[in-house]
């Protein structure tokens, strides 16, 4: 692992079910790039440099996004911000997931090809 190879001391690794290891009301901002490709996506066979687990998620690519959003609504401080990268065709569903988990002021940022790529919202509970 690069942490060992580079003798890096300024970060640590945590093995957890996404955000489950953190206390409630711990963060002002969470930024995530979770797996968001459907397990059945034909493009996965062409991606040889990344492990499938880093790219693909169950429930048509939404399983990890749902879990992170649900957990974020507990560990973010009030008015905290959640930002999640997602597929270009997932904006509508991701916004719905945010709304279902007490996020408001939900917006999406486009990538350099003008595709919806990152959705963010403010925790409002």
Predicted segments — roles?
Residues 1-124:
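S-adenosylmethionine
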